[in-house]
Amino acid sequence: MWIKICGTTSLADAQHAANSGASAIGFVLAPSPRRVTVDQVRAIAPHLPRNVERYGVFVDAGFDEIVTAVRDADLTGVQLHTNDDPDLPRRLRAHFAAEESSAPISILAVLAYSDDMEPQIETIARHAARYGAIDALLIDSRSPVGHGGTGTRYDWQAAQHLFRRVAPQLRLIAAGGLNPDNVAEAIRTLSPWGVDVATGVEAAPGRKDPARVAAFIRNARETFAQLKSPTRPRTRDARAAR
């Protein structure tokens, strides 16, 4: 199972998450109590295991800003929130594929869940599966407070059938209000490809609680292992198997 610890702001927190078995570390490069700079991420990146992915989280960021941040912060993935350019993922994919010196960059798109959003989410999933513009779709909570990191959750039972319909076409990541105590329920209900957490493992905004980080990762992996079956689709790379 793929697990991202997001909203990380320090080397100590990033290393602890990696050593606890996280698949990816998320760095918020947008207005947020967890915001970090490209320089901060660049200082952290060399000290993480190379098989742990490093995601930059962007809100309404343009093409040039994202490309520069990926290069300067040594990111391996981008998470895109609310950009008005529907072609941005495809343009980013083409750009990084054309750079011979660039390693493959993973692209996550984010949508906030609500009942009336289901047709749009399914359309995006079909388009993504056909054109390969994104690697996964992160389904977060809808909140007036901000984009991600709000600690609120959506109705997993209501979203269950959406996850089941879309999963054969596209990897889905569950996010929004997850914590060590409920991540097992989320995995059992939604059967996501991955999970993403920020506030649910914090001691304070931007500062992780080591025990909660370790418990979240342990509970997620144990639950996934219990549900795993030979028919589950294989992931495309070894990083997701961590």
Locate the predicted segments by residue:
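C-terminal helical cap(s) of enzyme catalytic domains, especially alpha/beta-barrels
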Residues: 40-48, 91-92, 99, 198-242
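N-terminal basic/disordered segments at the start of proteins
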Residues: 3-13
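Acidic, divalent-metal-coordinating active-site segment for phosphoryl/phosphodiester hydrolysis
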Residues: 11, 179-183
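A short, Lys/Arg-enriched amphipathic alpha-helix followed by its capping loop at the start of a domain
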Residues: 16-22
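Conserved, mostly hydrophobic/aromatic
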Residues: 17, 78, 137, 155, ...
